Design a protein with these regions (language model features):
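Nucleic-acid substrate recognition interfaces
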Residues: 1-356
Length: 356
């Protein structure tokens, strides 16, 4: 599989060179946008359909940009390639990338393996060395990469490398019920606590926002993101190592983000956890399944009878007893067990689903 290895550029003084290169990247990107929009304007004016420019068409049109803007020719090719991918995947045409102002695009400088040279903890691009913190070894099978900039104007170098999918995995099977009070409850009774990272720093963030200290506001937001990703990485790695089957409920964060629970839902980062579990399961050669979680919290995981608490009014009931078999359940653990049953296709979570 393809993994991205990200390292922070160590020498802050080279930022001006990367800033200059990123402005050149924006110039090539904006030229591609101009070509695309000129075709659209001609179609509106004349009604004659023209073929959209392909990757090779854009590279041919951008001939000479590499020498003029001091970019590697493969960088120009990668920009054109990414433009075509974005145009075909997005609902709207790609927009111009601003190099300045409040809505400027963050720096981005793509390359392929032959455009750079690795020298220990240095990467050489167009005869200039960029020193980075080499926190872990870089695999030899580098495919592509890029220099990227974050909101705090810090630069990173990223390498996309091909790594084998042969990490050892356990023999367990686990179902995971995502929630807000507890971030994730597993079918074996384990839980991942909801640490509410944003709420922990909310007061400090409000103070700096009122003071107009943009630098500290960016630093606090970065701290929140780093702490959140650290927790999710540790939890997802542990689950992927110990289980050969991982089943997660398909709760929609996008829909719940439109409700009054939006802050808690976005702070929980369910989608990020699911994505981590998916690619880590693939690397450990485990199965990852998103299961339909309807009725899983109301159905008894022992007999399948729908006798659990229903609706928002009974959401506060965390423990209940099945009226059919008399089994006592923790609401979230019971839901996680039913999610595992659905994903493993051993039996339906309920015997009879009542008609709506």
């Amino acid at each position: 599989m393809i993994l991205t290895f990200k390292y922070r550029i160590k020498d802050a003084t080279v930022g001006k060179y990367l800033d200059r290169h990123s402005r050149s990247v924006n110039a090539v990107w904006n030229h591609c946008v101009s070509v695309q929009r000129s075709i659209e304007r001609r179609y509106i004016a004349t009604g004659l359909k023209e073929r959209w420019p392909t990757h090779f068409d854009l590279v041919k049109i951008a001939t000479g940009y590499a020498a003029t803007l001091e970019l590697h020719s493969d960088t120009v090719s990668q920009i054109c390639k990414q433009f075509v991918i974005s145009r075909n995947a997005a609902r709207h045409a790609p927009r111009f990338r601003a190099s300045g102002g409040p809505k400027r695009a963050l720096g981005w400088l793509p390359f392929i393996k032959r455009a750079v040279k690795l020298d220990g903890a240095h990467v050489v691009y167009r005869k200039r060395k960029f020193h980075f913190w080499k926190s872990r070894d870089i695999p030899d099978a580098i495919k592509t990469g890029c220099f990227t900039q974050d909101a705090r104007d810090r630069w990173y170098v990223c390498f996309q490398c091909e790594v084998p999918d042969d990490l050892p995995t356990g023999n367990g099977e686990i179902g995971i019920d995502l929630g807000l009070k507890t971030l994730a409850t597993c079918s074996n009774g384990d839980t991942i606590p909801a640490l509410q990272h944003y709420r922990q720093f909310e007061a400090a963030l409000a103070v700096q926002q009122r003071a107009g200290n943009k630098r500290r506001v960016k630093a606090i937001h970065a701290k929140i993101a780093n702490v959140r990703k650290d927790q999710l990485h540790k939890a997802s790695t542990k689950i992927a190592r110990e289980n050969q089957l991982i089943v997660v409920g398909n709760v929609s964060a996008a829909q719940l983000a439109k409700t009054r629970m939006a802050k808690s839902v976005l702070d929980a980062s369910w989608s990020m956890l699911r994505n981590m579990l998916e690619y880590k399961a693939s690397r450990h050669r485990a199965r990852f399944i998103e299961a339909d979680e309807r009725w899983t919290s109301q159905a008894c995981s022992d007999c399948g009878a729908v006798s659990g608490p229903k609706g928002i009014a009974q959401l506060g009931i965390r423990h209940w007893v099945c009226s059919d078999c008399g089994c006592s359940h923790d609401r979230d653990v019971n839901a996680a067990r039913n999610i595992l049953f659905v994903g493993a296709e051993r039996r339906p979570p309920v015997e009879e689903i009542p008609a709506l």
